[in-house]
Amino acid sequence: MTDQPQRHRRWVLASRPHGEPTAENFRLEESEVPTPGPGQVLLRTVFLSLDPYMRGRMRRMSDAPSYSPPVAIGAVMVGGTVSRVVSSNHADYQPGDWVLGYSGWQDYELSDGNGLVKLGDDPQHPSWSLGVLGMPGFTAYMGLLDIGQPKAGETLVVAAATGPVGATVGQIGKIKGCRTVGIAGGAEKCRYAVETLGFDVCLDHRADDFAEQLAQACPQGIDVYYENVGGKVFDAVLPLLNTAARVPVCGLVSGYNATGLPDGPDRLPLLMATILKKRIRMQGFIIGQDYGHRIAEFQQQMGRWVQEGKIKYREQLIDGLEQAPQALIGLLKGENFGKVVIRVAADD
């Protein structure tokens, strides 16, 4: 490892956004590097994961209840991290150890070891533990296989098809013998989905005739729809769902910055009638709370698929902790291409 710097930076939540987050919602603070006490380790963040769920953690406590409490004003922004042990007063950790944790948006963290996962002595791609081999990959795996239950010959439609979850869902779908239709934003992403990820078709949701294109791409209807987006994408999908279709609901990123209900007529009666008449299974899930007990199964199978080249993975590395706020703002607008990871420090 390189010599540790003499400063400790951390991004805290300065204010709660109304609509889209702005740079003013975050504040960068500096202090001395902390010293571990008895039973503690000092972790230096190397990679920080940025994910859409972070927008929900910026909400007010008085907002609609969610599965995790909001970040307090003045507290460090949350986030999964890959770190290295700098110094240790803990019997299970030695300087130089690689660990997966939840240190958040900061250079250093003191930890008692609770919740840390060792990544081995010399992991080949340590940041992948935040992506295809971590929470996004696990989310794709369990959501599709346990809730979606794809069968060979079925049509699988995937929203946000080039994001870390959607890209993995589509590739697992191909492994299971599905016809896969991706939905993404822009020609470049759609081309990548087909040429690299192996989707049979990928449609640009920004097209004026997107709904018509989707209907043409799914002449036999939709058997499984993996929901990451919501909004007008779901509106186009709903009438195409087949009887006994399955809809794993992973995210609704199109509405994360919304300040109220969408314009237009109330869509709930149509949704409920469609679910009833077509016996559709639509289920939300929280990966850690619902499937944490199956992490070993996922790690074994996904590791094998990645090693065999059956699952391809794209990472968007951004250098510098100072870039985190703008990177998250861009992520929520769909400006990312692949899994967004902040490289906080050198990984040597």
Predicted region positions:
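NAD(P)H dinucleotide-binding glycine-rich loop of Rossmann-like/cofactor-binding domains
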Residues: 75-87, 91-160, 202
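C-terminal hydrophobic helical "lid"/dimerization subdomain
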Residues: 2-6, 289-348
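Glycine-rich beta-strand-centered segment in the early N-terminal region that forms part
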Residues: 32-50, 58-105
